[in-house]
Amino acid sequence: MINNKPIIGIPIGDPAGVGPEIVVKSLTEAEVYEKCNPILIGDAKVIKQAMGFCNVNLNINSIKKADEGKFTLGTIDLIDLNNIDIDELKIGKVQGIAGKAAFEYIKKSVEMAKEGELDAIATTPINKESLREGNVNYIGHTEILADLTDTEDPLTMFEVRGMRVFFLTRHVSLRKACDLVTKERVLDYIIRCSEALEKLGVKDGKMAVAGLNPHSGEHGLFGDEEMKAVVPAIEEAQKMGYKVEGPIGADSVFHLALKGRYNSVLSLYHDQGHIATKTLDFERTIAVTNGMPILRTSVDHGTAFDIAGTGQASSVSMVEAIILAAKYSPKFKK
């Protein structure tokens, strides 16, 4: 170790997608090295290829352990798993070798984080079809990380420009999401989200719970989920000492959070929170996975096979994910 900055592990994602390109571009940014010590987990051949795509010239320092890193701008510190035949890799295509390799990068990152070599990980895009082709039986990052860390139910938070958004429901139909708005579930998530914020070092302010219906139901005129589930859950949480308010109409709650009235918003369904964050700033919307023994941030875009290999992919989101991991990791450890 040369300094006391947090060490952030960055698995390079699906080697046939834009992941290698956006991490290479990210490591040309001085701000990244000002905030942390980044280490890539991937394949040197893939990284060299990505540098060619992006017209970037950086040195590669292959290491076995984190403390061997140089952590200087102009040099990539790399845990080289050497697991890709570059002649067989087809950029921009679904293929098993890429899915299998991407899984191995994640697995190695988690192992290093568990051993204390990494303070956090910032992940890059993987592809569900490539995972399946590679006989990796997971549907995505969160499921992989949950299994590798023995976490039953990870909690996703989005952060963009200081606004934090949690999700009561995620990948279910809107009809199903409405059915899942129960007093018990809302109360459970208020507690879990509050605990997640505390673990991230966010102790000031209060959480807002978004309304489900127009005008939060208007006392039952436009739906009764607020009266039957949301309000009772909030009142019970308040009695338990949690700082939470609501329901606040979804047309205004995110604006109020952005202005600083609330430290976070509990969104009641997937698109309610996604629309708010991504409209505010699509590229800087970063996912933070809570509830695990390790801290993970992630870009919120896919492998972009259509532009992979062209050097066009923006690294803005990747830089943001790395810096956010560096921001929260010292507090997360406490």
UniProtKB/Swiss-Prot annotation:
Family annotation (Pfam families): PdxA
Protein family (similarity comment): Belongs to the PdxA family. PdxA2 subfamily.
Oligomer and partners: Homodimer.
Gene3D superfamilies, A to Z: Isopropylmalate Dehydrogenase (3.40.718.10)
InterPro entries: PdxA_fam (IPR005255)
EC class of the enzyme, as a word: oxidoreductase
Catalytic activity annotation: 4-O-phospho-D-threonate + NAD(+) = dihydroxyacetone phosphate + CO2 + NADH
SUPFAM superfamilies assigned to the protein according to its UniProt record, in alphabetical order: Isocitrate/Isopropylmalate dehydrogenase-like
Protein name: Putative D-threonate 4-phosphate dehydrogenase
Transmembrane segments: none
Keyword field: Carbohydrate metabolism, Metal-binding, NAD, Oxidoreductase
Ligand binding (a divalent metal cation): H171, H215, H270
Cofactor: how bound: Binds 1 divalent metal cation per subunit.
Amino acids binding substrate: H141, T142, K278, R296
Function: Catalyzes the NAD-dependent oxidation and subsequent decarboxylation of D-threonate 4-phosphate to produce dihydroxyacetone phosphate (DHAP).
Domain of life of the source: Bacteria
Enzyme Commission number: 1.1.1.408
Cofactor(s) the protein requires to work: a divalent metal cation
Source organism per UniProt: Clostridium botulinum (strain Hall / ATCC 3502 / NCTC 13319 / Type A)
